[in-house]
């Protein structure tokens, strides 16, 4: 057991999907995994291990924001030996070419958080995805016919901003979307020499507020992202 995860050694696979929403983790386990067993209910942050196409995989919620994912991802890596972590979550589009229900593969993640500057206050340490995972996910998405964008995202500490014009300026520089976790996950992966990738479904278009999705859709209908994440996890087995 770790401080925040009640699983025993061996309960968690060495490859895992990480949705922010624990109910999305439950949905993935119930709809995609065979023989899924719940390994964690602490703080209702549900985690499950089962098989997908004969391969042992896990899925666990991480909550919202970089402090939360940092807790769970670190414990998964350090205490349970997880080697491959794929975030499957939502993001808000800021690139005018990116639209609701399309996918973004986060090649790199800029951040306005101090979570990394606590270690490197003198400069901005770049947070990048594992290229092998990125490449596999991109080709799997293309084979599935899913509209997918590859590029930088902004991992933000702020959901409701008072300065939206700053976000829009980033969109003009080619930043695809804003989300709240990838930079912290990538930093932990770099620290511990494991693999990580962020796959995001666009749930909101910050350039066009008429493009949006419901809370229920965010929880249960972004199945392309879930399938691509699972297929990417098992691609090396």
From Swiss-Prot:
The record marks 218 as: Important for catalytic activity. A purine D-ribonucleoside binds at residues 4, 179-181, 203-204. It is an enzyme of class 2 (transferase). Phosphate binds at residues 20, 24, 43, 87-90. SUPFAM superfamilies: Purine and uridine phosphorylases (SSF53167). InterPro entries: DeoD-type, Nucleoside_phosphorylase_CS, Nucleoside_phosphorylase_d, Nucleoside_phosphorylase_sf. GO terms for cellular component: cytosol. The active site is at 204 (proton donor). GO terms for molecular function: purine-nucleoside phosphorylase activity. Its EC number is 2.4.2.1. The keyword Transferase applies. Belongs to the PNP/UDP phosphorylase family. This is Purine nucleoside phosphorylase DeoD-type. It comes from Streptococcus pyogenes serotype M5 (strain Manfredo).
């Amino acid at each position: 057991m770790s401080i925040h995860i009640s699983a025993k050694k061996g309960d968690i696979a060495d490859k895992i999907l990480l949705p922010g929403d624990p109910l999305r983790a439950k949905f993935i386990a119930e709809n995609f995994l065979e023989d899924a067993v719940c390994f964690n209910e602490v703080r209702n942050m549900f985690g499950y291990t089962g098989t997908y196409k004969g391969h042992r995989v896990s899925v666990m919620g991480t909550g919202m924001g970089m402090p939360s994912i940092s807790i769970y991802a670190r414990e998964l890596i350090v205490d349970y030996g997880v080697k491959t972590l794929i975030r499957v979550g939502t993001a808000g589009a800021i690139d005018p070419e990116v639209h609701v229900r399309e996918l973004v593969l986060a090649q790199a993640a800029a951040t306005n958080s101090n979570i990394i500057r606590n270690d490197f206050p003198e400069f901005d340490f770049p947070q990048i995805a594992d290229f092998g995972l990125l490449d596999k996910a991109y080709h799997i998405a293309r084979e599935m016919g899913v509209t997918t964008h590859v590029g930088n995202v902004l991992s933000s500490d702020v959901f409701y901003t008072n300065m939206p014009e700053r976000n829009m300026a980033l969109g003009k520089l080619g930043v695809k979307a804003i989300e709240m976790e990838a930079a912290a996950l990538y930093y932990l992966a770099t620290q511990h020499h494991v693999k990580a990738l962020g796959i995001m479904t666009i749930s909101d278009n910050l350039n066009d507020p008429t493009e949006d999705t419901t809370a229920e859709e965010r929880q249960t209908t972004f199945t392309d992202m879930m399938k691509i994440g699972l297929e990417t996890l098992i691609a090396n087995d």
